[in-house]
A protein has these predicted regions:
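Beta-sheet ligand-binding and adhesion/scaffold domains
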Residues: 27-52, 76-129
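Hydrophobic helical h-region of N-terminal Sec-dependent signal peptides
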Residues: 10-15
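Bacterial N-terminal signal peptides that target proteins for export
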Residues: 1-9
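Boundary at the C-terminal end of the N-terminal hydrophobic targeting segment
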Residues: 21-25
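N-terminal, post-signal-peptide region of Sec/Tat-exported proteins
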Residues: 47-74
Length: 129
């Protein structure tokens, strides 16, 4: 094996190990997240409004917080999926659920879906403040 091949192999292994160890680190979602929420429902039609999400506590992949919307504030609890990118949260007094993605360290998407008589779909692009 040539010297250049060995150098390439060492660099490749270093990059692989570095990327693997970073992807195993559970992201921290604590903080206040603010952004525009775009929703659609039969009752309210197309709407865009300001959404505020506060993740108050996180322990490993589990977290809890509150979010504000037109009808008030709700408490929720959620989980970060093993891919360290996707998360889901639910509220006790809600018929739908929220699924999101970590887009950047301080930017997430959070999409809500609810079926049935109050069917609603919407996504928010949120930035941590």
């Amino acid at each position: 094996m040539s010297f250049n091949s060995i150098k390439f192999l060492i660099v490749f292994i270093f990059i692989f190990v570095t990327n693997t160890s970073q992807s195993n680190e559970i992201p921290n979602l604590e903080g206040t997240w603010i952004g525009k929420n775009n929703t659609l429902s039969n009752q309210r039609g197309f709407r865009t409004w300001e959404k505020k999400v506060e993740i108050l506590e996180q322990k490993d992949r589990r977290f809890k917080g509150t979010f504000s919307y037109t009808d008030g504030t709700k408490d929720f609890f959620g989980i970060i999926h093993p891919d360290n990118v996707t998360f889901t949260w639910v509220a006790a007094n809600s018929r739908g659920y929220n699924i999101g993605k970590i887009l950047e360290k301080n930017r997430i998407s959070a999409c809500y879906v609810e079926s049935g008589i109050d069917a609603t779909a919407g996504c928010a692009d949120l930035t941590r403040k």
